[in-house]
Amino acid sequence: MFIKGVILSSYGVNGYARIKSISNNFCDFINLKNNKVLLKKSNGFAIEVKVIDVNIKSNSLFLKFEGIDAPESVKPLIGFELWVDDSLASSLKEGEYYLGKLIGYTIVNDNRKLGEVVAFFEYLNNVFLEVKVGIKFFFIPFLSIYIGNIDAREKTIELKVLDLLR
């Protein structure tokens, strides 16, 4: 499953939810119509809902969920993440990756295993991989100057600059 967006607010009087897209690609949301998605809160609470309408207006995205017909019903869902099945995830271009799928990949250099990706985070428009090496943790910028080949079959990520692990 992939996170596709976050509920920001209610919209209108018919129970639409205003959504922030994680990928900024609204077109892929059209495929959610008549499909079930999982709404998850950071505390672990989750509910499954069916998307019955997708609306894009003025660079904003709105979803209507089955059984939610008033703004008051949307308000408790604000902040929930919208998770979708892998088959409904946005398509990727060459060289693009779902960061969540990189968790568990092994960091390598010259075929030597160095550590494992345990998390990622974004800060000031940059993505960092959190890498565990022994009992220490390091943050590696997800930039081509530091990161080389990513092998999905072997689940490895080449680290070009070893000094990042000191």
Swiss-Prot record:
Keyword rRNA processing on this protein?
yes
Q: What is this protein called?
A: Ribosome maturation factor RimM
Q: Which UniProt keywords apply?
A: Chaperone, Cytoplasm, Ribosome biogenesis, rRNA processing
Name of the coding gene: rimM
Disulfide bonds, paired cysteine numbers: none
Q: Name one GO biological process term.
A: rRNA processing
For this chain, the family text in UniProt reads: Belongs to the RimM family.
**Classification via NCBIfam families:** 16S_RimM, PRK14594.1
Q: Where in or outside the cell?
A: Cytoplasm
**Listed GO CC annotations:** cytoplasm; ribosome
Which Gene Ontology MF annotations are present?
Answer: ribosome binding
Q: Which organism is it from?
A: Borreliella afzelii (strain PKo)
PRC barrel domain residues are 94-165
Q: What is known of its domains?
A: The PRC barrel domain binds ribosomal protein uS19.
